[in-house]
Amino acid sequence: MKNALIVNGGQNSTVRDQLQSFDFIIAVDSGAEHVYKLFLKPDLIVGDLDSIEEKTLERAKKDKIEILKLEENKDQTDFEIAINYIINKKCENITIIGGEYGDIDHLFGTLFSIVNLQNNEKIIWIHGNQKILFPNSSTIDIGT
Protein backbone atom coordinates (compact mmCIF):
# COMPACT_ATOMS: atom_id res chain seq x y z
CA MET A 1 0.00 0.00 0.00
CA LYS A 2 1.48 3.32 -1.03
CA ASN A 3 -0.90 6.14 0.02
CA ALA A 4 -3.32 6.10 2.94
CA LEU A 5 -5.66 8.74 4.31
CA ILE A 6 -6.65 8.91 7.97
CA VAL A 7 -9.66 11.14 8.60
CA ASN A 8 -9.85 12.13 12.23
CA GLY A 9 -12.95 13.39 13.99
CA GLY A 10 -13.32 16.95 15.17
CA GLN A 11 -13.39 19.99 12.95
CA ASN A 12 -12.04 19.61 9.46
CA SER A 13 -11.45 22.43 6.99
CA THR A 14 -9.89 20.27 4.28
CA VAL A 15 -11.44 20.44 0.84
CA ARG A 16 -11.35 17.72 -1.79
CA ASP A 17 -8.87 19.46 -4.09
CA GLN A 18 -6.25 19.39 -1.31
CA LEU A 19 -6.22 15.60 -1.49
CA GLN A 20 -4.49 13.18 -3.81
CA SER A 21 -5.63 9.65 -4.57
CA PHE A 22 -5.40 7.03 -1.85
CA ASP A 23 -5.13 3.25 -1.76
CA PHE A 24 -6.85 3.07 1.63
CA ILE A 25 -9.05 5.47 3.60
CA ILE A 26 -9.57 4.96 7.31
CA ALA A 27 -12.08 7.07 9.23
CA VAL A 28 -11.61 7.57 12.96
CA ASP A 29 -15.06 7.56 14.58
CA SER A 30 -16.88 10.74 13.48
CA GLY A 31 -14.20 11.24 10.83
CA ALA A 32 -16.49 9.08 8.69
CA GLU A 33 -18.78 12.08 8.37
CA HIS A 34 -15.92 14.12 6.89
CA VAL A 35 -15.11 11.30 4.46
CA TYR A 36 -18.64 11.28 3.10
CA LYS A 37 -18.76 15.11 2.93
CA LEU A 38 -15.65 14.97 0.73
CA PHE A 39 -17.50 12.53 -1.57
CA LEU A 40 -15.12 9.73 -0.65
CA LYS A 41 -15.83 6.32 0.82
CA PRO A 42 -13.89 4.87 3.77
CA ASP A 43 -12.41 1.40 3.59
CA LEU A 44 -12.49 1.10 7.37
CA ILE A 45 -14.06 2.94 10.31
CA VAL A 46 -12.19 2.61 13.61
CA GLY A 47 -13.38 3.82 16.99
CA ASP A 48 -15.55 3.35 20.02
CA LEU A 49 -18.27 5.01 17.90
CA ASP A 50 -19.20 7.46 20.64
CA SER A 51 -19.21 10.51 18.36
CA ILE A 52 -20.36 9.20 14.99
CA GLU A 53 -23.90 10.11 13.94
CA GLU A 54 -26.31 7.19 13.62
CA LYS A 55 -27.18 8.11 10.02
CA THR A 56 -23.47 7.97 9.09
CA LEU A 57 -23.09 4.60 10.76
CA GLU A 58 -26.15 3.29 8.91
CA ARG A 59 -24.78 4.57 5.61
CA ALA A 60 -21.45 2.85 6.27
CA LYS A 61 -23.23 -0.43 7.00
CA LYS A 62 -25.28 -0.03 3.82
CA ASP A 63 -22.04 0.62 1.89
CA LYS A 64 -20.58 -2.55 3.47
CA ILE A 65 -17.71 -0.62 5.07
CA GLU A 66 -15.64 -2.62 7.55
CA ILE A 67 -16.19 -1.26 11.07
CA LEU A 68 -13.72 -1.96 13.87
CA LYS A 69 -15.66 -1.10 17.05
CA LEU A 70 -13.36 -0.51 20.00
CA GLU A 71 -14.03 -0.54 23.71
CA GLU A 72 -14.51 2.87 25.31
CA ASN A 73 -11.96 2.13 28.04
CA LYS A 74 -8.62 1.40 26.41
CA ASP A 75 -4.97 2.36 26.67
CA GLN A 76 -4.79 3.98 23.22
CA THR A 77 -6.93 6.59 21.52
CA ASP A 78 -9.00 5.71 18.48
CA PHE A 79 -6.54 7.74 16.39
CA GLU A 80 -3.51 5.86 17.75
CA ILE A 81 -5.14 2.55 16.88
CA ALA A 82 -5.95 3.83 13.38
CA ILE A 83 -2.45 5.09 12.64
CA ASN A 84 -0.86 1.90 13.97
CA TYR A 85 -3.22 -0.12 11.77
CA ILE A 86 -1.98 1.79 8.70
CA ILE A 87 1.68 1.52 9.74
CA ASN A 88 1.29 -2.25 10.16
CA LYS A 89 0.04 -2.34 6.55
CA LYS A 90 3.47 -0.96 5.51
CA CYS A 91 2.04 2.16 3.93
CA GLU A 92 4.66 4.55 2.54
CA ASN A 93 2.73 7.83 2.70
CA ILE A 94 0.14 8.73 5.31
CA THR A 95 -2.01 11.84 5.05
CA ILE A 96 -4.06 12.92 8.05
CA ILE A 97 -6.96 15.37 8.03
CA GLY A 98 -9.36 16.47 10.74
CA GLY A 99 -8.92 17.03 14.44
CA GLU A 100 -7.92 20.63 13.87
CA TYR A 101 -9.83 22.41 16.58
CA GLY A 102 -12.13 21.62 19.46
CA ASP A 103 -10.84 19.99 22.61
CA ILE A 104 -7.19 20.92 23.07
CA ASP A 105 -6.45 17.53 24.63
CA HIS A 106 -7.55 15.85 21.39
CA LEU A 107 -5.37 18.18 19.30
CA PHE A 108 -2.30 17.51 21.45
CA GLY A 109 -3.12 13.82 21.64
CA THR A 110 -3.06 13.57 17.85
CA LEU A 111 0.12 15.62 17.62
CA PHE A 112 1.98 13.59 20.25
CA SER A 113 0.77 10.31 18.76
CA ILE A 114 2.39 11.25 15.46
CA VAL A 115 5.58 12.68 16.96
CA ASN A 116 6.16 9.61 19.14
CA LEU A 117 5.97 7.14 16.26
CA GLN A 118 9.14 5.28 15.34
CA ASN A 119 8.40 4.96 11.68
CA ASN A 120 9.74 5.10 8.16
CA GLU A 121 6.56 6.45 6.62
CA LYS A 122 6.12 9.98 5.36
CA ILE A 123 3.32 11.57 7.37
CA ILE A 124 1.56 14.78 6.41
CA TRP A 125 -1.16 16.39 8.53
CA ILE A 126 -3.27 18.81 6.51
CA HIS A 127 -4.37 21.47 8.96
CA GLY A 128 -6.55 24.07 7.28
CA ASN A 129 -4.57 25.37 4.32
CA GLN A 130 -1.26 24.25 5.81
CA LYS A 131 0.55 20.95 5.51
CA ILE A 132 2.60 19.76 8.45
CA LEU A 133 5.31 17.30 7.44
CA PHE A 134 6.56 14.98 10.17
CA PRO A 135 10.16 13.82 9.80
CA ASN A 136 11.05 10.18 9.45
CA SER A 137 14.26 8.34 8.76
CA SER A 138 14.34 9.42 5.13
CA THR A 139 15.91 12.51 3.65
CA ILE A 140 13.77 15.38 2.48
CA ASP A 141 15.19 17.24 -0.52
CA ILE A 142 13.89 20.78 -0.79
CA GLY A 143 14.64 22.26 -4.19
CA THR A 144 15.71 25.87 -4.49
Where are these regions (language model features)?
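Short, well-ordered alpha-helix to beta-strand connector turns
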Residues: 22-23, 42, 64, 91, ...
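Flexible, surface-exposed loop/linker segments and immediately adjacent secondary-structure boundaries
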Residues: 68, 79-82, 101, 107, ...
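N-terminal beta-strand-loop-alpha-helix module at the start
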Residues: 1-60
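Short phosphate-binding loop-to-helix
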Residues: 67-89
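Short Gly/Thr/Asp-enriched flexible loops that form oxyanion-binding sites at enzyme active sites
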Residues: 104-115
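Long, charged alpha-helical interface segments
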Residues: 126-144
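N-terminal glycine-rich phosphate/adenylate-binding segment common to multiple enzyme folds
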Residues: 92-103
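A glycine-rich helix N-cap at a beta->alpha junction
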Residues: 63-71, 122-124
